[in-house]
């Protein structure tokens, strides 16, 4: 039984996404359905968390929109993600960057890996 589950989950995994980590600035191209139309919406921000493994793996992206922090969680292997671009590689020493929620302005910057 577990072999069947393993095979099904392996077929659902995506291999076309680039490697990214917490601290990286990414652009997520999300497919949005509005009525009968489908369009692509960009969501650019810093990856603050990556959790889980296999088919249930998720990541959270945080951005500031009009002075308000917005966080959005995406499953890594969802077909709703059309594309994912890594804009900048960030150098951080933590796996979960929850402390960024309390920082404002220049204090919330992350050093870039050269």
Curated annotation (Swiss-Prot):
Gene Ontology annotations of biological process type: translation
> What GO terms fall under cellular component here?
cytosolic large ribosomal subunit
Query: Matching Pfam families, A to Z?
Result: Ribosomal_L19
Q: Name a GO molecular-function annotation.
A: structural constituent of ribosome
Keywords linked to the UniProt accession? Ribonucleoprotein, Ribosomal protein
Q: In the UniProt record, does the keyword Metal-binding occur?
A: no
Q: Which InterPro entries match?
A: Ribosomal_bL19 (IPR001857), Ribosomal_bL19_CS (IPR018257), Ribosomal_bL19_sf (IPR038657), Translation_prot_SH3-like_sf (IPR008991)
Name the domain of life this protein comes from: Bacteria
Family named by the database record:
Belongs to the bacterial ribosomal protein bL19 family.
**Role played:** This protein is located at the 30S-50S ribosomal subunit interface and may play a role in the structure and function of the aminoacyl-tRNA binding site.
- Protein name, entry field: Large ribosomal subunit protein bL19
Q: What would be the name of the gene that encodes this protein?
A: rplS
């Amino acid at each position: 039984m577990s072999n069947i589950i393993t095979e099904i989950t392996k077929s659902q995994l995506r291999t076309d996404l680039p490697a990214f980590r917490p601290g990286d600035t990414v652009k997520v191209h999300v497919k949005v359905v509005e009525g009968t139309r489908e369009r692509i919406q960009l969501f650019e921000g810093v990856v603050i968390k990556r959790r889980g493994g296999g088919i249930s793996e998720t990541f959270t992206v945080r951005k500031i929109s009009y002075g308000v922090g917005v966080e959005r969680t995406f499953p890594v292997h969802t077909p709703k993600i059309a594309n994912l671009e890594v804009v900048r590689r960030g150098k951080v020493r933590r796996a979960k960057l929850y402390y960024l929620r309390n920082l404002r302005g220049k204090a919330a910057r992350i050093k870039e890996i050269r």
